[in-house]
Amino acid sequence: MNQIDAIEMAQMKKNIPKFIPGDTIKVQVKIVEGDKSRIQAFQGVCLGRQNGGIRESFTVRKISNGVGVERVFPLHSPSIEAIEVVTRGQVRRAKLYYLRKLRGKASRIKERKYVAGQ
């Protein structure tokens, strides 16, 4: 292992849940305003994951007051406090950019069902 890999491994978070595009996730983001800090939740559908390793990021989309809002989060950012998987979605694509054009019930994602023991 070279020095760059060792530094990257030390900076990577260990407590990240497994999630894939289509999952509804809640991201707890630390926001610092002046000398105060607070935690803000951003809940939406994961549209995709990009890159890998320390540079990995993911895109989350939600509808807020009838307007679509997308946010790209670096996966290993220190400003992310926690990531929670709310529901697991069943999709057949790695990038769900087609959801940007859909409105209302058409933009719903089928929920993935699990069999005990898997």
Swiss-Prot record:
Keyword check for Secreted: no
Any one Gene Ontology BP term: translation
Coiled-coil regions listed: none
Cystines in this chain: none
UniProt keyword terms in alphabetical order: Ribonucleoprotein, Ribosomal protein
GO molecular function, one term: structural constituent of ribosome
A GO term from the CC aspect: cytosolic large ribosomal subunit
Family affiliation: Belongs to the bacterial ribosomal protein bL19 family.
NCBIfam families according to UniProt: rplS_bact (TIGR01024)
Xref: HAMAP family: Ribosomal_bL19 (MF_00402)
Record function comment: This protein is located at the 30S-50S ribosomal subunit interface and may play a role in the structure and function of the aminoacyl-tRNA binding site.
Name of the featured protein: Large ribosomal subunit protein bL19
Species name: Citrifermentans bemidjiense (strain ATCC BAA-1014 / DSM 16622 / JCM 12645 / Bem)
Lineage per the UniProt record: Bacteria, Pseudomonadati, Thermodesulfobacteriota, Desulfuromonadia, Geobacterales
